[in-house]
Amino acid sequence: MTQTTPDSREDAWLERSRATLAKAQPGARAEAVGRVEHVADGIALVSGLPDVRLNELLRFEGDRFGFALTLDADTIGAVLLDDADAITAGSIVTGTGQVVQVPVGPGLTGRVVDPLGRPLDGRGAVHADARMPIERPAPSIIERDLVAEPLATGILLIDALFAIGRGQRELIIGDRATGKTAIAIDAIVNQKNSDVICVYVAIGQRASAVERVIAAVREHGAPERCVFVFASSAASAGLQWIAPFSAMTIAEYFRDRGQHALVVIDDLTRHAATHRELALLTREPPGREAYPGDIFYLHARLLERAAKLSPERGGGSLTALPIAETDAGNLSAYIPTNLISITDGQIVLDTGLFAANQRPAIDVGLSVSRVGGKAQMPALRNVSGRLRLDYSQFLELEMFSRFGGLTEARVKAQVVRGERIRALITQPRFTPLRPVDEVALLGALAEGVFDALPVDLLPAIRTRVAAHLDAHGGNAGAVLEDTGTLDATAQALLVAAVRTLAQDCATASATAPPDPPAASAAELPQPDSP
């Protein structure tokens, strides 16, 4: 057995060192160095870096970072991603040769991160498979496929009238506090038992509001299949600006591997305001409503990344649900019209409907899905064909009925049907319906099963329909999930099951003891005299 002596180990190390030195090429390395000319409001004007490209990541003195937003002949308008207090005029700046990147991979699911992928949930470092640039080109036409597969939201009104397909971009728009985020979160919750990875990005919102969103998903959904990207109102404008692009990149990782992803952007109105702020600070010429001229291109290149890929590219999909806020219902403002023209449809929320306690408060007349109808389940399409027309006619007749009584039997029947439609589509939060539940309810509605029932029984029927169909619906649910269609026999079985449920609810309501009368003022306990 040969023993290794200290001298032999030293000789081996010396040989390796000589080989390394032989490959070395000593010499000075040139590195472009710039300086900060001026810094204020999260923007630094940098000079001395002529070779920096647009959106390139810049390293500032003190290991701070920013990116190049505007390029002039002599200066760069850099947006700071970190605290600007440590950066002063004269600070050294170097280019990194890379654009801003974000970590991606399954290790991000279940985590709360900032737009740079840094953890915000106190659960340690994020384990990523790779890092990808936040700005990536959208798939070309050759790489895309038709949007032909539904993305179920569990919301009856949306799935029936404004169906969303996987790979679609559907705008959710309305005034402040009308339930825009609630619809998006319900859509995320409904993916609990599906194969869809959800990414929720909050831009410029309060931490308490985002905490409520995360808590709702943890209570009702599958947080282990969600990624939460958060740029709070206290974060730098740069972090808020890159937030939706980071979320898109995180979702694209799953799409490019043949999986399905859903991105909720909450919201693009604040993102547009952030872009306007940065553009004005970097002295970009303002346009309509003081927005820079590239605001349309900014959101177009972001939302174009949502797509259904062809089978040759893996067949994955990325569905986008951007949210936008209107002012006093003005859909003709600059940002709303831009987003409506970019997306494949819009769900418009109405303040009056919300005040009337209708949830979701969707304006049926102004909402549309230009793509999702082709992806809707045929069975659901068959039973929802007249729903929109019947409901629209009811709303018009209801308005006229306030000025006088309705005497014609046909008109009375339309009002009766419309009242039951409204009761059926008024759906509380976190109560998603399965496709088979929706088909059964709408089929029974079309058959007139609910016409003779009191309107106040419809919520109870909607709540109990899932359990009742599991017991009496046969294998219709499994067939619907596999094929999207039902034959006449299966459809009749579902309608019969709902009819039985309606009769049971009516019987239970008739035999229930009446509510005790309200106590009069004299019978109420009086407070003690002082």
UniProtKB/Swiss-Prot annotation:
**Which reaction(s) does its UniProt entry say it catalyses?**
ATP + H2O + 4 H(+)(in) = ADP + phosphate + 5 H(+)(out)
PROSITE patterns documented for this protein: ATPASE_ALPHA_BETA
Where does it primarily localize? membrane
Question: What GO molecular function terms would the record report?
Answer: ADP binding; ATP binding; proton-transporting ATP synthase activity, rotational mechanism
Any one GO CC term of the record: plasma membrane
Residues the record marks as site: Required for activity: S367
Query: Which parts of the sequence bind ATP?
Result: G174, D175, R176, A177, T178, G179, K180, T181
Bias (Low complexity):
507-522
Its membrane topology is listed as: Peripheral membrane protein
Q: What class of enzyme is it?
A: translocase
* Cross-referenced InterPro entries: ATP_synth_asu-like_sf, ATP_synth_asu_C, ATP_synth_asu_C_sf, ATP_synth_F1_a_nt-bd_dom, ATP_synth_F1_asu, ATPase_a/bsu_AS, ATPase_F1/V1/A1_a/bsu_N, ATPase_F1/V1/A1_a/bsu_N_sf
Q: Under which EC number(s) is this enzyme classified?
A: 7.1.2.2
Subunit (UniProt): F-type ATPases have 2 components, CF(1) - the catalytic core - and CF(0) - the membrane proton channel. CF(1) has five subunits: alpha(3), beta(3), gamma(1), delta(1), epsilon(1). CF(0) has three main subunits: a(1), b(2) and c(9-12). The alpha and beta chains form an alternating ring which encloses part of the gamma chain. CF(1) is attached to CF(0) by a central stalk formed by the gamma and epsilon chains, while a peripheral stalk is formed by the delta and b chains.
* HAMAP family xrefs: ATP_synth_alpha_bact (MF_01346)
Q: Which NCBIfam families match?
A: atpA (TIGR00962), PRK13343.1 (NF009884)
Q: Which protein family is it in?
A: Belongs to the ATPase alpha/beta chains family.
Briefly state the protein's biological role.
Produces ATP from ADP in the presence of a proton gradient across the membrane. The alpha chain is a regulatory subunit.
Task: Tell me the protein's name.
Answer: ATP synthase subunit alpha 3
Native species of this protein? Answer: Paraburkholderia xenovorans (strain LB400)
